[in-house]
Amino acid sequence: MSGHDSGNAKRGRASFGAFVRKPVERDVVASAGEAAEQGSLEAVQAWPDDAVEVGAVVDAYGLKGWIKVATHADAGRGGDALLDARRWWLERGGERLSARILQSKTHGDTVVAHAAGVSDRDAALALRGFRVFVRREDFPALAADEFYWVDLIGLEVVNEQSVALGTVSGMIDNGVHSIMRVEYPAVGKDGQPTTDERLIPFVGVYVKTVDQAARRIVVDWEADYS
């Protein structure tokens, strides 16, 4: 179970967020009707509640206003969502923009895209440094036994004896499979309350059920395991 995760091991590295899956090599092109309504970049005050950061604008691509986005992992985590979403949300400092995406495609380990209102290289270069978000609802659908990392954060973890082990605080990938970072309350050497962490491999031999509706993960893991 990987960062998008299933019972099969996936490659990729990521420190947080969405999923690990190599973006499908494809072009996504706006229809004639969409192109007729290109519009422009829009400054926004309201921000989607389900916005998930999936990359950052790192450069211009070519001379016609395309931008290059580094996704949040070597394996392209965020790439499929970037290709599927027809609107991106951009943030740099206190500035927030909404961008209608007319075309997008993979380019090596990056995603390149043409946003409405960005017509030349200078305009594309002006977007360098913007973090790129897409709405969670725009993520591609997964198989029944696959999960996006962002959906696992905050879930309670219990073992098969119903002993509470903590809460998922993050996910890491060791290159073979994903690992849950599970935080739980503890007592420090000074006798003061603190937070400790256990690492549980996110693979089928240990992870028995993931119930997103109940916000609970059941694992085969003893409370005294490190």
Swiss-Prot record:
The PRC barrel domain binds ribosomal protein uS19. Residues 144-225 form the PRC barrel domain. An accessory protein needed during the final step in the assembly of 30S ribosomal subunit, possibly for assembly of the head region. Essential for efficient processing of 16S rRNA. May be needed both before and after RbfA during the maturation of 16S rRNA. It has affinity for free ribosomal 30S subunits but not for 70S ribosomes. The keyword Isomerase does not apply. Binds ribosomal protein uS19. Pfam families: PRC_RimM, RimM. It is found in: Cytoplasm. This is Ribosome maturation factor RimM. The gene is rimM.
